[in-house]
Regions:
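Non-catalytic, conserved peripheral segments adjacent to functional cores
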Residues: 1-109, 128-130, 140-159, 163
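Conserved metal-binding segment of the jelly-roll/cupin
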Residues: 106-128
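Short, structured patches in soluble enzyme cores that scaffold and shape functional sites
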Residues: 135-138
Length: 164
C-alpha cells in the first residue's frame, strides 16, 4: 500500500536504518502499515521476523544495552505510546565503525521505526511519563545468550538527545 521513507547507514554505521512509514490521516484518525515485507525488502531489510515483543516502562527507565552472543537478532523497533531515546552500538569486530553508536528519538507521535541489524547492542531510555515499546526479532529469545554494556561506558560516550 504505502511506501516507506528510509534513512540508511545512520551516523555512517552500515546497516542501521530509520524508517518513516506512510501515514494516511483524515478526520477519523489515521492508518499506516507498520510492516510490509515487499517495502522493507526493497529498502534492504530482507529478513524473517519470528517473534514480536512489547514492553511498558515509566519515565527514566533504561533498558539495555543488550546484545545476543550466539543467537544474534535483527530488530525492528517502534513506540506505540510515549517517547524513548533508542540507541544501537556497533559490536561487529571487523567493522570500521566498531564501538560507534547512533541514537534516535522514537515516539507515538513521530511514528518512526529503527532497524538494528545483528551484532549490535541495543537499548533505550524512556523520555515521556510512560512508553510502550514494540519490536520484531529474527531469532527466539535465549535467556542464557544475552550480554550487556553499560550506557555510561567511557569508550562509547552516549549523549542525551538534543531538544529543539
Amino acid at each position: 500500500m504505502g511506501k516507506i521513507k528510509v534513512t540508511n547507514d545512520c551516523n555512517g554505521i552500515k546497516g542501521l536504518k530509520v524508517i518513516e512509514p506512510a501515514v494516511f490521516g483524515d478526520a477519523r484518525g489515521y492508518f499506516m502499515e507498520t510492516y510490509n515485507y515487499n517495502d522493507f525488502k526493497e529498502a534492504g531489510i530482507d529478513c524473517e521476523f519470528v517473534q514480536d515483543n512489547q514492553s511498558a516502562s515509566k519515565k527514566g527507565v533504561l533498558r539495555g544495552l543488550h546484545f545476543q552472543i550466539n543467537y544474534p537478532q535483527d530488530k525492528l523497533v517502534r513506540v506505540v505510546s510515549g517517547e524513548v531515546f533508542d540507541v544501537a552500538v556497533d559490536l561487529r569486530s571487523d567493522s570500521k565503525t566498531y564501538g560507534k553508536w547512533f541514537g534516535v528519538v522514537l515516539s507515538a507521535e513521530n511514528k518512526k521505526q529503527f532497524f538494528v541489524p545483528k551484532n549490535f547492542a541495543h537499548g533505550f531510555i524512556v523520555l515521556s511519563d510512560y512508553a510502550e515499546f514494540c519490536y520484531k526479532v529474527t531469532d527466539f529469545y535465549h535467556p542464557n545468550d544475552e550480554g550487556g554494556i553499560l550506557w555510561n561506558l567511557s569508550l562509547i560516550h552516549i549523549s542525551e538527545p538534543t531538544r529543539h
